[in-house]
């Protein structure tokens, strides 16, 4: 494996002056060539990519699958906007929508930066496609869309609790996969997903109990 090193920078003598010295340029990053090959000057982005830990198939599967998983949560919130007047649910839905959309953008960027396929947001909803853990089936989504008022509130909370539980299963599967989550970005992201989903499951479980009294 070729090493990436910083080339030494020779600086001219510095003379005292009333004028401030110009900003120093960062040292160029070079990659020594093999015998007979020339040395290459690398961009900062390429050098960082070469030093980045390897990406495993489990990493890619997790990010691709979680995009579809998050997209369904956004779809569920869209239904909530017109089917209930419960203010607490609307506030919950707003938080879920903002976080899920932001995380979808993050996952898409992660995949693009590593040259991986970025699936469409509803790739997991297609007929015959295998759903990620916790995702609602087409029949369950149709039942949720047809529900109103109190019935909708109950189905939304139970469905979203199930949905979040599936995300936890996906994180656990990732961490249990050999060679996975060595990339610092995906490790931090998956850890945040786990913490956030657990917190929201606890919140929604409390909301469901209050509405069943």
What is the role of each PLM region?
Residues 20-213:
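All-alpha RGS (Regulator of G-protein Signaling) helical domain and cognate RGS-like helical scaffolds
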Residues 1-6:
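Bacterial N-terminal signal peptides that target proteins for export
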Residues 14-17:
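C-terminal motif of bacterial Sec signal peptides marking the signal peptidase cleavage site
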